[in-house]
């Protein structure tokens, strides 16, 4: 995701070198930075009108932050790698304290990591921020950065509350809201959808989202790469709700006017394999009995699997995919488990079978008896039995 930043004023810079160990390997490193290969050079900016965020690396798993005097920066706790570029004594010029963002409300909204470090300095400074942060048990998985510049013209709904990794802005407004379970009547009427229709984003264990508005800069983290998708007016996109990181909205109630649950028209009956129906007698032979036993086992397993699937979908919300209606922008992350867009339905080879006694055929001999003008036709397997 390409983000352009414009900074006014004069700036002086020098370079430091960050050497990824995975890229260097057995390479001999020289005594000068200019002699070192496979390095990322970061600018140290001494004069800026406002702080600057820049995602670096490939993939961009590190955030380079250039701070300005007296402007507080909020960084996810446990993710600061380095503080550098401070003029004078570090402890005298820079201070940091713990900042909790609505801890009680965040916990019930599904944001279980709302602890940030508030960093402020009396002189310009620079930070290196890792995309991973400390958790209660170990550390989070590797993620990548995307930087958003909010100009106050549109709001962003961040579906994954834990994606907000760093931010600044005196006029930046960050609020928590409940994800609506149902779409609005107006949106249902305009889209030709029945009522009630689910939005598909609601989860019982994570029922909230973060609304970002105002002016400021926010650094988001997501699994894998982060992509920006733009939808024109009237366009729709089917998106996995696990991949949906955020979307632009017009206020806190716009989700129920733009997102609804995706339902495939493909039915499981359409995916069954057509074949000749088997008529078996389960007790005619041992093989048929084993087939009958297998049928009961598979049917019980399918019933248990469907029950678990229905329970999980009820707890999570609804299906795996949602339909998003434009005009708006979407942020999609690629590093999450994928789901199949089409409903999976395995062919049921036993439900197509009819458990009826096996029909047998045999050869018979027919004879005709004419008695007093009446004709009578009878069959016998052996003419000798007629005597």
Swiss-Prot record:
Gene3D superfamilies per record: Mitochondrial biogenesis AIM24
GO biological process: inner mitochondrial membrane organization
Subcellular localization, as worded in the UniProt entry: Mitochondrion
Superkingdom: Eukaryota
Disulfide bonds: none
Assigned keywords, A-Z: Mitochondrion, Transit peptide
A GO-annotated cellular component: mitochondrial inner membrane
InterPro entries linked: AIM24, AIM24_sf
Presequence boundaries: 1-23
Similarity annotation: Belongs to the AIM24 family.
Name of the protein described by the UniProt record: Altered inheritance of mitochondria protein 24, mitochondrial
